[in-house]
Amino acid sequence: CGICRTDLDVVEGRVKAPTYPVIPGHQIIGRVARIGGKSSDFRDGDRVGVAWINSADGVCRWCRAGMENLCPQFRSTGCDVDGGYAEYAVVPAAFAYSIPDGLTDAEAAPLLCAGAIGWRSLRLTRLTDGERLGLIGFGASAHLVLQLARHRYPSSPIHVFARSPAERAFARDLGATWTGEIGDAPPDQLDAIIDTTPAWKPIVDALPHLAAGGRLVINAIRKSSVDKNELLRLDYASHLWMEREIKSVANVTREDVKQTLAAAIEIGLHPTVEILPLRDANRALARLSNAKGLRGAMVLDIAES
């Protein structure tokens, strides 16, 4: 099961579970152990994935439009229902995904959320090939977005803003055109920016570097309240005028997950992962909170625990 910052949000209470205790984890890879009577999509032993979206009502206007991520009855894995930091999990068959043979379990896990929400964020930028893209932060999601963007928009320069020299070097290794510290000025105005950090300051710092008509997409379920006073620095003329847009990402759809898995196979995308035993889950979440010593995504190996 992949480890995600949203797991930390659930554990620390920024995302409220309806009941506690709850088992976190929503980037699950496993084998089908038992099938309900009405299921015909899978067989016992099939390798499947389970993502953040655990179910939706299927009848509201959002579900009918293929946007079940906005369903008022949206239920999330590892929050509304128990998740993947466990030996077994239960999921509706319609919200499970066949995992392609070209990916290991550990590689496939982060694609289910870090990859899928990154894919959705990239689509929401409405970037066209040749336009300049910025990525703020360079963790599990951003390192996948960079690779997806290079494939989808091969002529687009990609600028990465990251805190540590190691993260910036990692971004350059994966093909970033330019790297700088968070808050640095890029060499050119950016047509789109995807923010993957938990804080507000990087967004406020980045907005003046957004070109006229540019889009900034916030790739996060929640933002920290620690630095929310940074929003008081917003100046309409320098941060928002000239039809700049700020857009949030709300969850993912099933189609986002399917497209991400298909794209990974098409371009040979193999997430950089660190595999840890379940007993290290708390230490892994602490590392995620501090954002120190991370390269790519962390994945818990439940079977070896």
Question: Which ranges hold each PLM region?
Answer:
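C-terminal hydrophobic helical "lid"/dimerization subdomain
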Residues: 162, 254-305
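Cytochrome P450 core scaffold surrounding the K-helix E-X-X-R motif
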Residues: 6-9
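Glycine-rich beta-strand-centered segment in the early N-terminal region that forms part
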Residues: 1, 12-61, 100-102
